[in-house]
Amino acid sequence: MTGIRAIFYYFLVDLLTLLCWAQGKGGQHFGSTVVVSDVNLSNHGDQGSSEPPQTAEGCRGYFDVMGQWDPPFNCSSGEFLYCCGTCGFRYCCKFKQARLDQNTCTNYDRPVWLQPGKTPPKIDDPSHDPTRDKTNLIVYIICGVVAVMVLVGIFTKLGLEKAHRPQRENMSRALADVMRQQSHCATEHTERDPNLVIHVQHYETMPSRSSANNLHSSKINNVVPTSPHLPQMAHPHSYPTMGQISNPYEQQPPGKELNKYASLKAVAEKGNDDFYSKRRHLAELAAKGSLPLHPVRVDQERSYSPEGGTLKVNGQKAKANKIHTHPLASTYNPDYKTWDHSEHSLRRQAYATKKHCPVESVNEPLQSQNQHFMPSQPYFVTNSKTEVTV
């Protein structure tokens, strides 16, 4: 029984000894046993290999990513004793395991792209395939679509112009043919009817405001000269420029138009002056009461009408003399002809037919001219103050 207790105490003492050694507590008595702590269990040779103290480490100078030179510096402030970071950005730290191996960096020399006159060598990237790069494909597609649209618009415009061009040419040709037929018809009608006067006016050369002389001259040119006091100007061959109507597509020189207008104006003013001077002379004789009963013979001026027209007039006047049985009718001279409203209407009809003259009117017989001539009323001269013209 006593042996068992001794063994139990022995194990208990050993256990307590181990606990005290672990906690570093010495000098404690457990009963009769003294436990000694801080026992050096190592050999005597291991006592000389103690770790030396850490020294400060410096970072070397380098070129950063912007090409600027960063000077070297030392890590000697407190606990920050190690050079840490990357090759392009370095700093001091206190963890040894994060220290940077500066021997692996290559940015200690000046970069090539900073040296003037030298281009950096092209580094082929094996991961980059230019055949698979489609970033510029969108630009090419947009430019191609715009170019195609522009070409389509241009060709469409050209096609429309070409489609409308034959119609315009046909219209211009048809208009030219119609104008040419009208001018030819007007010329033929004028040559057939010598008692009609064509009054040609060029509106481009006429002034904006017409004077009194121009108005009188235009009225006289439109009147058929049936009286011997007014010279006849109906002959189309006296003034060749009046009988021909110019082509509207041909631009005449302004000098010829001015000469034509001046000649027509001079002839009209001369006829107007002669007519009114002779009429004033007859009015003065009628006022004085000294008009003779026999007709006054006035020398006829040179007539511009053809001889055929005067013969027809004389023949018609002879018929008129046979019809009238008035005593004074024997004194009537067939050469004297007064104004008649029927002739004015006939002239208006002639001008109307000239504007709408068909092609068949050129082949009409010449006997239709006799329809334009009607016997006119004679002019009787008396001494009465209330003289009336019939």
Curated annotation (Swiss-Prot):
**InterPro entries membership:** Shisa (IPR026910), Shisa_N (IPR053891)
| GO CC annotations, alphabetized | dendritic spine membrane; ionotropic glutamate receptor complex; postsynaptic membrane; synapse
Coarse class of the protein's main subcellular location: membrane
Q: How does it sit in the membrane?
A: Single-pass type I membrane protein
Topology Extracellular: residue spans: 23-134
Ranges facing Cytoplasmic side = 156-390
Q: Which residues cross the membrane?
A: 135-155
Signal sequence extent: 1-22
The subcellular localization recorded is: Cell projection, Dendritic spine membrane; Synapse
Q: Name one Pfam family in it.
A: Shisa_N
- UniProt entry keywords in alphabetical sequence: Cell membrane, Cell projection, Glycoprotein, Membrane, Postsynaptic cell membrane, Signal, Synapse, Transmembrane, Transmembrane helix
Highest taxon, organism lineage: Eukaryota
Tell me the GO BP annotations in alphabetical order: regulation of short-term neuronal synaptic plasticity
Entry-listed glycosylation sites: N40, N74
Explain the purpose of this protein.
Regulator of short-term neuronal synaptic plasticity in the dentate gyrus. Associates with AMPA receptors (ionotropic glutamate receptors) in synaptic spines and promotes AMPA receptor desensitization at excitatory synapses.
Q: Which family does it belong to?
A: Belongs to the shisa family. SHISA9 subfamily.
Quaternary structure, per UniProt, is: Component of some AMPA receptors (ionotropic glutamate receptors) complex.
Record-given protein name:
Protein shisa-9
Organism of this sequence: Xenopus tropicalis
